[in-house]
Amino acid sequence: MASLIYRQLLANSYAVDLSDEIQSVGSEKNQRVTVNPGPFAQTVYAPVNWGPGEVNDSTVVQPVLDGPYQPASFDLPVGNWMLLAPTGPGVVVEGTDNSGRWLSVILIEPGVTSETRTYTMFGSSKQVLVSNASDTKWKFVEMMKTAIDGDYAEWGTLLSDTKLYGMMKYGKRLFIYEGETPNATTKRYIVTNYASVEVRPYSDFYIISRSQESACTEYINNGLPPIQNTRNVVPVAIVSRSIKPREVQANEDIVVSKTSLWKEMQYNRDIIIRFKFDNSIIKSGGLGYKWAEISFKAANYQYNYMRDGEDVTAHTTCSVNGVNDFSFNGGSLPTDFAISRYEVIKENSYVYVDYWDDSQAFRNMVYVRSLAANLNDVMCSGGHYSFALPAGQWPVMKGGAVTLHTAGVTLSTQFTDYVSLNSLRFRFRLAAEEPSFTITRTRVSKLYGIPAANPNGGREYYEVAGRFSLISLVPSNDDYQTPIMNSVTVRQYLERHLNELREEFNNLSQEIAVSQLIDLAMLPLDMFSMFSGIESTVNAAKSMATNVMRKFKSSKLASSVSMLRDSLSDGASSIARSTSIRSIGSTASAWANISERTQDAVNEVATISSQVSQISGKLRLKEITTQTEGMNFDDVSGAVLKAKIDRSIQVDQNALPDVITEASEKFIRNRAYRVIDGDEAFEAGTDGRFFAYKVETLEEMPFNIEKFADLVTNSPVISAIIDFKTLKNLNDNYGITREQAFNLLRSNPKVLRGFIDQNNPIIKNRIEQLIMQCRL
């Protein structure tokens, strides 16, 4: 029947990568390399071990000390130690919360007997009795008062031979050091007004993070590092620590010059380049032990990434140049493993990555100067590829690595289906790295570079980060685009052609005779007979069929059937039948497209009509996998398609793939399907209508949705070419026998042709309605 064309396409369509649609990018240069193992063949070549050489250490060393800073009053950051380094006796530091704590730390030199000294603390002169019995260590004394007009009292001391003192705000407390070096420890005071604590040092000081408290304690007890005690270290003002760094815009557009019509714009951009290699592996004919070619192909990749908060859509095309041709011949017998040619990229090769994104920089990239780029290096390593031999152990090509180094950037153009993209071509030179690549169970070993068998090594893509800058001559009016951006590509021309073809196709529906449609629907239309009416089809039959199958592979029908085949057997065995209507959603999805299961929350509130609509939407797939003798909607669709192709003057072999794909998805949107159980028929349409009736009397009966779900799971599904409404109308006006009713229910094409030959208006009108639904 005519639906054979769809089944044939489903059975023979194959996946085609984007790279098949891209012609050769740049020039190609091949270099033949002959490997002569010589006397070292059995010892895996000469005993030479190549390594990567010096490897740089990228460890980041973070400084501990921040300073020194000059004395100045400031708000000590919470969670940071202030390490004071006074040079002589006197007041070292003051700190207060202006409500319950006034702390002043004084320093007393060694060997001081008890005496009274005058100190200026918080702006007032105070006489303090001091002493230091130690002859070697300096003494820090904490003088504290708890009221603004109170008297100072000694709260703690620190004997130090390093002459260093520490203070920190943290956890609503004030921390200091007490005791005697080298065993000084921290002490804390509760501060009432923690947020307003202000510290004023009277000596040079350093800032140390609390996370480095152990280092601070080490300095207090044992002194600063020698580098801090040289005359080359000069204290700076504390305000320098508060200078806010100016945020430089990494991605910016700068007007270099401007006239009335044109302006020069400098575009600076950070970019992330993602690319991947593609390959072609061709097996020779024969017994299955020979491979003809393993080669690199250009590969497209589209992705998104964030740049300064902007979502950027980028497109790359990766190609190689200067490949090296290798070969392997395991013997002259038909069962000896051999590869006629396999490509390898190494030191004498180049990798080209064409990059484009949707930013302003690429909008008018026609006249460009001062183009520069700086990219990181990236290491590419090959993966495993097993040569599946009919018998014996499989050889495996594995390993290989190269590093890509930036070698320059030029302008280029990428061609896609819809538009030509002015882009940047980044050129990379290669350096061979470890490991080498080998072919196991052969003498091919210790070769350097990446072979084309599996150049991505299982990765989705390689990534390079970098930056480019260019100056572009663009129109002064930002809304205007240079002419090259409006150029018509092959795909754009085809789109305009398809629009004209759709209009012509839809007008041809009225010219199709119903009798001719039935005749065509009953024919087993294959690929050649379906397209035989197109000029030059005979001469280009192979390429035309390939293009049709390639396009049809991406259709909704092909992808749905593909998933159905994988899930049908597992899903049918896991059907959970329930007395509740809610179970129907899972019952239907057991054999339908599993990825589109209705959520439980939706099923709880769904009506019978909506559930029937969901089920009937999948019945086309069920019918395709279980062919019946009756005529189905795809037979009608295929027949209409054939009739319109024969009459059309717009269709050609370039437009045909799009026509076939669109017809499979859009022809006859309103379909009804039925299942028969004895004398009972159940019918459901994609519009949510459902009927249950007796075949002999055509009397309606209650629609048992649970039984319907069981039947569509286990029984053949039939296209309701003559739906229940038409059938009942036919019986009421003309009367039909039980046998005629069964034949019409089963969509018997001979019976349908008989009614049409009798010029039955009801049947004829129904078929004409189906023809009118075959629109693009």
Swiss-Prot record:
Keywords: Capsid protein, Coiled coil, Disulfide bond, Hemagglutinin, Host cell membrane, Host cytoplasm, Host cytoskeleton, Host endoplasmic reticulum, Host membrane, Host-virus interaction, Membrane, Outer capsid protein, Viral attachment to host cell, Viral penetration into host cytoplasm, Viral penetration via permeabilization of host membrane, Virion, Virus entry into host cell
Region span, Spike body and stalk (antigen domain): 248-479
Coiled coil: 491-518
Spans annotated as Spike foot: 510-776
GO biological process: permeabilization of host organelle membrane involved in viral entry into host cell; virion attachment to host cell
Gene Ontology cellular component annotations, sorted alphabetically: host cell endoplasmic reticulum-Golgi intermediate compartment; host cell plasma membrane; host cell rough endoplasmic reticulum; host cytoskeleton; membrane; viral outer capsid
Protein's organism: Rotavirus A (strain RVA/Cow/United States/WC3/1981/G6P7[5]) (RV-A)
InterPro entries per UniProt: ConA-like_dom_sf (IPR013320), Rota_A_VP4 (IPR042546), Rota_VP4_MID (IPR035330), Rota_VP4_MID_sf (IPR038017), VP4_concanavalin-like (IPR000416), VP4_helical (IPR035329)
Domain of life: Viruses
Site entry: Cleavage: 231-232, 241-242
Alphabetized Pfam families for the sequence: Rota_VP4_MID, VP4_haemagglut, VP4_helical
Motif (KID motif): 644-646
SUPFAM superfamilies documented for this protein: Concanavalin A-like lectins/glucanases, VP4 membrane interaction domain
Cross-referenced Gene3D superfamilies: 1.20.5.170, 2.60.120.200
Site (Probable cleavage): 246-247
Lineage of source species: Viruses, Riboviria, Orthornavirae, Duplornaviricota, Resentoviricetes
Region (Hydrophobic): 389-409
Region (Spike head): 65-224
Assigned protein family: Belongs to the rotavirus VP4 family.
UniProt motif (DGE motif) ranges: 308-310
Note from the entry: This strain probably does not use sialic acid to attach to the host cell. In group A rotaviruses, VP4 defines the P serotype.
Name of the protein this chain belongs to: Outer capsid protein VP4
Disulfide pairings: 318-380
